[in-house]
Amino acid sequence: MDDAAVLKRRGYIMGINLGEGSYAKVKSAYSERLKFNVAVKIIDRKKAPSDFLEKFLPREIEILAMLNHRSIVKTYEIFETSDGKVYIVMELGVQGDLLEFIKTRGALQEDDARKKFHQLSSAIKYCHDLDVVHRDLKCENLLLDKDFNIKLSDFGFSKRCLRDDSGRLILSKTFCGSAAYAAPEVLQGIPYQPKVYDIWSLGVILYIMVCGSMPYDDSNIKKMLRIQKEHRVNFPRSKHLTGECKDLIYRMLQPDVNRRLHIDEILNHCWVQPKARGLSSGAINKEGESSRATEPSWIPEPGADKKSATKLEPREEARSEARSESKPQEDTLQVVRQSENVGLSSELNRDTEEGHPQQPSETHT
């Protein structure tokens, strides 16, 4: 039985193709029960690799079934047919994804970015409180509903965190995601704290929201890693970002995993909290550290004209809600160059100012 017939029997009228990979595709469909359009991810077990079937797909299905948050794509139904096809019926991002939105409209104003970033951060806190990590946070996985609210999608790399006998989270050894959003410890192949990895990716996303460009050029991974480990974050002067916004980004893009912000610290940061905005620069001391953890510590260097931010170039192809690449094997670095996936230009922004550099981070074991 073909997909249209299977979906028809379940009360869905199949629509257009939204995306297709080697063993999965996404179709739009109209739900006769819900009375609106949905997205249907169809996975063919016969074509999928064994590691995906044995590890990643069961994790994704388990996690999708347990999540219920206003800023996470809803999963309405999951079913499987006798011929080995899995159907995941999900909320449709009717306004596309955040990357295409920014490519079309440019960088967001801080108030709009704050709203969207708060929605995303609230979704991540919800997940982290459940010991669920996403591990593939990027603008393409942030869908927009009819009112342009953020809907976190694609839990293909997600997992439940395990704890040891003392209650500490066990480090992850699956190195996954896109290089442009990957934390330094992941790029280096070091076993990592998955929740802390998510925080780095949040920092990259916020940078893209307010700058309209990537914070790092991933065409040269070794060079990018060196810049990241030196804690260099360059902001376009033309964007006139507030110190509070730069400070939050700088703290999330902290190479030292022991100093990187926790999700609760992000949500309590003065830029995210409406009542705390407008903090005077007097709260920052000479060393660039604030008197409270949530106050700005970012200090620009006058005259700096470094090059690391990479422009986003418009793409012709629309982004689908489903990932098409296979999942990685354990202990194998599988980060993907973002420029290969989304058509980023290697041209660099020159109109930048650099964040206050820190000492190189200590080796994390």
Curated annotation (Swiss-Prot):
Molecular function as annotated in GO: ATP binding; magnesium ion binding; protein serine kinase activity; protein serine/threonine kinase activity; protein-containing complex binding
Keyword Cell cycle among UniProt keywords: no
Known tissue expression: Testis-specific. Expressed only in postmeiotic spermatids at the final stages of cytodifferentiation in the seminiferous tubules (at protein level). Not detected in released sperms in the lumen of the seminiferous tubules and the epididymis.
Active site: 136 (proton acceptor)
Residues annotated to bind ATP: 18-26, 41
Positions with biased composition (Polar residues): 331-347
Stretches the record annotates as Disordered: 282-365
Keywords: ATP-binding, Cell projection, Cilium, Cytoplasm, Cytoplasmic vesicle, Developmental protein, Differentiation, Flagellum, Kinase, Magnesium, Metal-binding, Nucleotide-binding, Phosphoprotein, Serine/threonine-protein kinase, Spermatogenesis, Transferase, Ubl conjugation
PROSITE patterns: PROTEIN_KINASE_ATP, PROTEIN_KINASE_DOM, PROTEIN_KINASE_ST
UniProt domain Protein kinase: residue ranges: 12-272
Family indicated by similarity: Belongs to the protein kinase superfamily. CAMK Ser/Thr protein kinase family.
Binding partners and assembly: Interacts with TSSK2. Interacts with HSP90; this interaction stabilizes TSSK1.
Name listed for the protein in its UniProt record: Testis-specific serine/threonine-protein kinase 1
Organism this protein belongs to: Mus musculus
